[in-house]
Amino acid sequence: MPSQKWSTKFQVAGYGGLENMKHMVVKHFPENIERFVEPFGGLGRITDLVKADEYFINDKSDYAYNFLKNKFPNYVVENMDYIDFLKEYATPNSFVFCDPPWRKNIYKNHERPAFTEKNVITYYEKLLELLPKLHCEWIITSDRDEHENGHRLQKSGYPNITMERKTGTGKFFGRNPAVRLCSNIWRNQNDWG
């Protein structure tokens, strides 16, 4: 039986942190994107805001996959393991946006999780290992303090920024919506958009 906990339903439906932060997040994307590659497409909320020459979107959930196919009929939409998807579609002229699962409760409290890794930490470890080998530009997201992924982004050696939306959205889990971004795009603070 699916969880009846409000916080878990909220996480499965889409954590409001990224949903309410998306306009701030895309300001940190490269200006000219040839290939936009999104291995954790969800419902395409970020994709809606991206201008690119080509789009490649993936989600392992059957619901999200079908939703994306209908919403973006002219984009390449896949239902693959995220690693296989990245190896197939990420090229040196790609910008890869990764928003992997942030919360452990999704695993514990969701009836049929459409996840390919045993836990949240593994997503971050594998992404940080693979993305540099693909020679593309990328951003990975997480919750602001990374308490559930063991601070993998902060420890990665790549620049991190944390953004918080202070007005107009209400609180999520008792705090303002916020997101951490980690990327190979930024060299110094002046590059942070």
Label each region the model flagged.
Residues 1-193:
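Class I S-adenosyl-L-methionine-dependent methyltransferase catalytic core
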